[in-house]
């Protein structure tokens, strides 16, 4: 197992959550939620985070329905976001199924912090954690 640093994003049209993790431990931590306008973040803010953490790989959650089918409205936009990350920063980017990540993130946050922990930014960042930890699990199976 390598010791790569991996960054993950949970794409949304109003907010984009992020997380960072280490492949060797398979663990991830929430970073920051970026405000977005119709899916477009402030790219300067994203750049600052990428420069600070210098990830070896970026994982972007791929929104699908419960059967794994792409969603007409949001899936293409998440793919476009992933392509822009690669184009702007030259980092390898992978898409990863994010089914049920928000539900799992809400449950995790509620368990440790109750209703007060359920802010939109916290949920989006925890969703990025769930996406990244799921990606780690897939690498090991």
Curated annotation (Swiss-Prot):
Alphabetical list of HAMAP family matching this protein: Nuclease_YqgF
Function, as annotated: Could be a nuclease involved in processing of the 5'-end of pre-16S rRNA.
InterPro entries (alphabetical): RNaseH-like_sf, YqgF, YqgF/RNaseH-like_dom, YqgF/RNaseH-like_dom_sf
Species assigned in the record: Aliivibrio fischeri (strain MJ11) (Vibrio fischeri)
Subcellular location: Cytoplasm
Gene3D superfamilies reported for this sequence: YqgF/RNase H-like domain
The keyword Protein biosynthesis belongs to this UniProt entry's keyword annotation: no
GO MF term (any one): nuclease activity
Any one cellular-component term (Gene Ontology): cytosol
Domain of life where this protein originates: Bacteria
Stated family: Belongs to the YqgF nuclease family.
SMART domains listed in its UniProt record: YqgFc
Keyword field: Cytoplasm, Hydrolase, Nuclease, Ribosome biogenesis
Name this protein carries in UniProt: Putative pre-16S rRNA nuclease
EC number, UniProt record: 3.1.-.-
Xref: Pfam families: RuvX
One Gene Ontology biological process: rRNA 5'-end processing
Major enzyme class: hydrolase
């Amino acid at each position: 197992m390598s010791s790569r640093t991996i960054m993950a994003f949970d794409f949304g049209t109003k907010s984009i959550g992020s997380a960072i993790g280490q492949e060797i431990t398979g663990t991830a931590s929430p970073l920051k939620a970026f405000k977005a306008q119709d899916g477009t973040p402030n790219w300067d803010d994203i750049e600052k985070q990428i420069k600070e953490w210098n990830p070896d790989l970026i994982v972007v959650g791929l929104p699908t329905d419960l059967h794994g089918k792409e969603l007409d409205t949001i899936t293409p936009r998440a793919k476009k976001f992933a392509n822009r990350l690669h184009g702007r920063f030259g980092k390898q980017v992978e898409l990863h199924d994010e089914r049920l990540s928000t539900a799992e993130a809400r449950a995790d946050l509620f368990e440790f912090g109750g209703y007060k922990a359920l802010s939109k930014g916290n949920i989006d960042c925890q969703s990025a954690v769930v996406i990244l930890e799921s990606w780690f699990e897939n690498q090991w199976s």
